[in-house]
């Protein structure tokens, strides 16, 4: 099902945060930001991630579980493994997603199904299992990574936009469900970022996207990571059920 690589001891910690999709540019930045803020992080991705790839010279600890989050039936055991090996999580960042694009009338059904499974079903099911630990502790944080595409139309991203809109609806309703137990649930909606997901768009498209932003550039990955770290903090204890946008003003 999955394999484990760890530099952390198997002790429960109230500041343990699980981050999915840490093999990507945004997920790695989120993990690094949390570690620098003093959290212990367990990353999940299909590709193994060495601690040095995430932490650099920071003072925190990073552990990794290699798993396919698209395997919905295996998520229950994955959650059990995380709790058994690393302790009860304080926070969860649902970052892993796939960005399949294309005009909807010509997309294969299998591509649509995979996108919905990875971007919607998987984070909902993982949240189901890991928030059980937060409920018993009566404290916790859930941050879902959405996208400006959830609110602003982009050509060729109908299915992707639907998946991100679903996560924002999930965020608002889950905040109502578990808020009385001291758990906040929020979403962060990045605009286009300078990561591997935009590297193949071509110069003309990249220029057009940047001109659309009020600041005339892409949003910075580190800025998104900082927003996630803020939402994990005690300073954000009264922020729940909302989506915070980091897009250099592209939706202004």
Task: Report the location of each language-model feature.
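Alpha-helical segment proximal to the catalytic Tyr-Lys
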Residues: 132, 176-180, 237
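Active-site loop immediately N-terminal to the catalytic Tyr-X3-Lys motif
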Residues: 105, 152-158, 180-181, 216, ...
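C-terminal substrate-recognition "lid" of short-chain dehydrogenase/reductases
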Residues: 124, 217-246, 251
């Amino acid at each position: 099902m999955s394999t484990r690589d760890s530099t952390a001891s198997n002790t429960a910690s109230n500041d343990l945060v699980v981050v999915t999709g840490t093999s990507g540019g945004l997920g790695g930045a989120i993990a690094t930001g949390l570690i620098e803020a003093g959290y212990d992080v367990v990353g999940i991705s299909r590709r193994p991630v060495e601690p040095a790839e995430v932490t650099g010279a920071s003072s925190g600890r990073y552990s990794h579980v290699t798993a396919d989050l698209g395997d919905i039936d295996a998520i229950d055991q994955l959650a059990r493994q995380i709790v058994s090996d690393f302790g009860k999580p304080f926070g969860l960042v649902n970052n892993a997603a796939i960005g399949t694009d294309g005009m909807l009338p010509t997309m294969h059904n299998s591509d649509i199904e995979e996108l919905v499974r990875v971007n919607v079903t998987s984070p909902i099911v993982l949240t189901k299992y890991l928030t059980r630990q937060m409920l018993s502790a009566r404290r916790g944080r859930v941050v879902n990574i959405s996208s400006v595409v959830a609110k602003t139309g982009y050509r060729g991203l109908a299915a992707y936009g639907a998946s991100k809109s679903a996560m924002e609806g999930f965020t608002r309703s889950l905040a109502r469900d578990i808020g009385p137990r001291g758990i906040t649930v929020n979403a962060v909606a990045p605009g286009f970022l300078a990561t591997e997901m935009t590297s193949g768009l071509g110069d003309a498209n990249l220029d057009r996207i940047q001109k659309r932003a009020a600041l005339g550039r892409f949003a910075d990955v580190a800025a998104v990571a900082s927003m996630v770290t803020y939402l994990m903090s005690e300073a954000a204890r009264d922020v729940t059920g909302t989506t915070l946008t980091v897009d250099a003003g592209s939706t202004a």
